[in-house]
Amino acid sequence: MVMTDPIADFLTRIRNANQAKHEVLEVPASNIKKGIATILKNEGFVKNVEFIEDDKQGIIRVFLKYGPNGEKVITNLKRVSKPGLRVYSKREDIPKVLNGLGIAIISTSEGLLTDKQARQKNVGGEVIAYVW
């Protein structure tokens, strides 16, 4: 069966592993998934990310992060722009997630950026997902 939205599948796997309190998650790799995983690591939503090369497309290993009492660092992930309904944002209209407590992941001409980085670089693009 052909997967129509691999980004939504990646976010759903993270959400499900987070709900089940798993420590490690492995998903098939792609460039955009690597970019999203790197942003999640840089913003402190996950502990670590490893990129494993194999003879196929590779694997991304995501180490999920929890608080001292087991509380989830990632409250929710929401896919915004979907294959059936693309959502674009001009540089002036870049959304803030929970008044800056969360992040928006945006695909721009500069690559994958958070909403803060896109505002600093003054670029707009496709709003991939919200994370809070």
Curated annotation (Swiss-Prot):
Swiss-Prot/TrEMBL keywords: Ribonucleoprotein, Ribosomal protein, RNA-binding, rRNA-binding
Gene Ontology MF: a single term: structural constituent of ribosome
Annotated coiled-coil segments of the chain: none
Source domain of life: Bacteria
PROSITE patterns tied to this protein: RIBOSOMAL_S8 (PS00053)
TM region positions: none
InterPro entries: Ribosomal_uS8 (IPR000630), Ribosomal_uS8_CS (IPR047863), Ribosomal_uS8_sf (IPR035987)
GO CC annotations on file: ribonucleoprotein complex; ribosome
GO biological process, one term: translation
Summary of subunit composition and partner proteins: Part of the 30S ribosomal subunit. Contacts proteins S5 and S12.
Purpose of the protein: One of the primary rRNA binding proteins, it binds directly to 16S rRNA central domain where it helps coordinate assembly of the platform of the 30S subunit.
Family: Belongs to the universal ribosomal protein uS8 family.
PANTHER family named among the record's database cross-references: 40S RIBOSOMAL PROTEIN S15A
Protein name (database record): Small ribosomal subunit protein uS8
Species, as recorded: Streptococcus suis (strain 05ZYH33)
Lineage: Bacteria, Bacillati, Bacillota, Bacilli, Lactobacillales
Primary gene name: rpsH
